[in-house]
C-alpha cells in the first residue's frame, strides 16, 4: 500500500508549439540544454519521495516512451511501484482514446487500485518548475481537504488561459472557473491536484456516466465537487513556474534559466537536482576563436563561433565567423561559417548553410528553423531572412 501515488498527464499534442511538436508530444520537447520538459515534473516526484508514478501518454509517444524507459534516471526502476507508461487501450470492458484529463485517470483506475493509495497526486508533464509535493500533501492532510489545488498568481493578461479561482484567508476555495473570458481573479490553478482517492474515484465514475461531460478536471470534476460543498483548499506556490504551451513562453522559459535570479529557479541547486538521461558524449569544446557568454553549451558540442545568451544542446557544431544570440539550438545541429542566428529556435538534426542569417523581431515570437523550412526558404548558397 502506498500513501500517495502520482499520475502524470503527458499525452498533450501541444498544437500551439507548432513544428516543435509535429513529431512528438509536448513533454518530450528538449529544454534547458540537456533536458526534456517532462524531466522537471518527474524530478519533482523523485525529490519529493513520490515513488510510484503512472505516466499517461497518447499523442505521438515514441520519443517520450524511449526517453522514460524504465525510469532509471529518476531512480524509479523499482520492482514495486516506480514508473509505468499508461497509453490508451481497449478491452472487454471498454477503453478508448483519452477524451479529457479526468477520463485519462478514469481509464486507469485499475492501475491506481493496485497500490491502494490514500491520496492521488495529479500532475502535468508540460510545465517548468521545482516543487516539493510533500509540502502540499502535508497541508492537504492538515486541513482535512478533499482536494488541494496548487495555485499561483499570473499576469492579468494571461489569466484567461488558466483555471481561475477565489480563496479566503484560510485558503478555502469558494469559486472556480476554467479559462474565463473575463477573469475576476489572477489566482490560477497550476494543474496540480491532490485528491483523497476514495472521493476522486466516486466523482470519476459519476462523470463517466454523464453524456454531456467534457471529462476534464477543470471543467467538470472540480466544479462538481465545489457545488457539492466538498473541502477544496488552495496551496499557494511562490516559486518559478512556467506553462510552456506557446512558442513565446517556451523561448522565454529557456532564456529564464540563463538569468542569475529568475524567481527561485536554478538548474544548479544540488538539493533539488533535475534528472535526465546522460548522453555519454565527451565534454564540449570551444576553439581558439570561439567564445561563449552567459550560455549553456552541452556535451559533444564544438564551438568555433560566438555564442551569447543562448542554450546549445548536445553534439552541436558552430563554425568560425558565426554569431548566435538569444537562441535555442537543439541536438545534432550543424551551423556553417558566417551565419547569424538571433532569437531563433533551431530544431534537432538541422544543417544551416554557410552565410545564413535569421533574425526574429522582438514584436513577434521567435522563428523555428528546421531542414524542411530551410529547403523551402533558402537558396543553396544561403540567404537572409
From Swiss-Prot:
Claim: Nucleotide-binding is one of the keywords in the record: yes
Subunit structure comment from the entry: Homotetramer.
Xref: InterPro entries: ADP-Glc_PPase (IPR011831), ADP_Glu_pyroP_CS (IPR005836), GlgC_bac (IPR023049), GlmU/GlgC-like_hexapep (IPR056818), NTP_transferase_dom (IPR005835), Nucleotide-diphossugar_trans (IPR029044), Trimer_LpxA-like_sf (IPR011004)
Keywords per UniProt: ATP-binding, Carbohydrate metabolism, Glycogen biosynthesis, Glycogen metabolism, Nucleotide-binding, Nucleotidyltransferase, Transferase
Protein name: Glucose-1-phosphate adenylyltransferase
Catalytic activity: alpha-D-glucose 1-phosphate + ATP + H(+) = ADP-alpha-D-glucose + diphosphate
Residues engaged in binding alpha-D-glucose 1-phosphate: 98, 163, 178-179, 189
Domain of life: Bacteria
The keyword Membrane is assigned to this record: no
NCBIfam families with a match to the protein in the record: glgC, PRK05293.1
Gene, per the UniProt record: glgC
Function: Involved in the biosynthesis of ADP-glucose, a building block required for the elongation reactions to produce glycogen. Catalyzes the reaction between ATP and alpha-D-glucose 1-phosphate (G1P) to produce pyrophosphate and ADP-Glc.
Pathway: Glycan biosynthesis; glycogen biosynthesis
Catalytic activity, EC: 2.7.7.27
Amino acid at each position: 500500500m502506498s500513501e500517495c501515488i502520482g499520475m502524470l498527464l503527458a499525452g498533450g499534442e501541444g498544437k500551439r508549439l507548432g513544428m516543435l511538436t509535429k513529431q512528438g508530444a509536448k513533454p518530450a520537447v528538449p529544454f534547458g540544454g540537456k533536458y526534456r520538459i517532462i524531466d522537471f515534473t518527474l524530478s519533482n516526484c523523485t525529490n519529493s519521495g513520490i515513488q510510484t508514478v503512472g505516466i499517461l501518454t497518447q499523442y505521438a509517444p515514441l520519443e517520450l516512451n524511449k526517453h522514460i524507459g524504465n525510469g532509471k534516471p529518476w531512480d524509479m526502476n523499482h520492482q514495486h511501484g516506480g514508473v509505468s507508461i499508461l497509453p490508451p487501450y481497449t478491452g472487454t470492458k471498454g477503453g478508448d482514446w483519452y477524451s479529457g484529463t479526468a477520463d485519462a485517470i478514469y481509464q486507469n483506475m485499475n492501475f491506481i487500485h493496485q497500490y491502494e493509495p490514500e491520496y492521488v497526486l495529479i500532475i502535468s508533464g508540460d510545465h517548468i518548475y521545482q516543487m516539493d509535493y510533500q509540502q502540499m500533501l502535508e497541508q492537504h492532510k492538515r486541513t482535512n481537504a478533499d482536494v488541494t489545488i496548487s495555485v499561483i498568481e499570473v499576469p492579468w493578461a494571461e489569466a484567461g488561459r488558466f483555471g481561475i479561482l477565489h480563496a479566503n484567508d484560510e485558503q478555502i476555495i469558494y469559486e472556480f472557473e476554467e479559462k474565463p473570458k473575463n477573469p475576476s481573479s489572477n489566482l490560477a490553478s497550476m494543474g496540480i491536484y491532490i485528491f483523497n482517492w476514495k472521493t476522486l474515484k466516486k466523482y470519476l465514475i459519476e462523470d463517466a456516466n454523464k453524456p454531456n461531460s467534457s471529462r476534464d478536471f477543470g471543467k467538470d470534476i472540480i466544479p462538481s465537487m465545489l457545488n457539492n460543498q466538498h473541502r477544496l483548499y488552495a496551496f499557494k506556490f511562490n516559486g518559478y513556474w512556467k506553462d510552456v504551451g506557446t512558442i513565446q513562453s517556451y523561448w522565454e522559459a529557456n532564456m529564464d534559466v540563463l538569468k542569475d535570479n529568475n524567481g527561485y529557479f536554478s538548474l544548479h541547486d544540488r538539493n533539488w537536482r533535475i534528472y535526465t538521461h546522460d548522453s555519454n558524449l565527451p565534454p564540449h569544446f570551444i576553439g581558439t576563436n570561439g567564445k561563449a557568454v552567459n550560455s549553456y553549451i552541452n556535451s559533444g558540442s564544438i564551438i568555433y563561433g560566438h555564442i551569447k545568451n543562448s542554450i546549445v544542446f548536445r553534439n552541436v557544431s558552430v563554425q568560425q565567423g558565426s554569431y548566435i544570440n538569444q537562441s535555442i539550438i537543439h541536438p545534432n545541429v550543424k551551423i556553417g561559417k558566417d551565419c547569424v542566428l538571433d532569437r531563433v529556435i533551431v530544431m534537432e538534426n538541422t544543417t544551416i548553410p554557410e552565410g545564413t542569417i535569421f533574425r526574429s523581431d522582438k514584436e513577434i515570437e521567435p522563428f523555428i528553423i528546421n531542414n524542411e523550412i530551410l529547403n523551402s526558404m533558402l537558396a543553396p548558397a544561403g540567404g537572409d531572412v
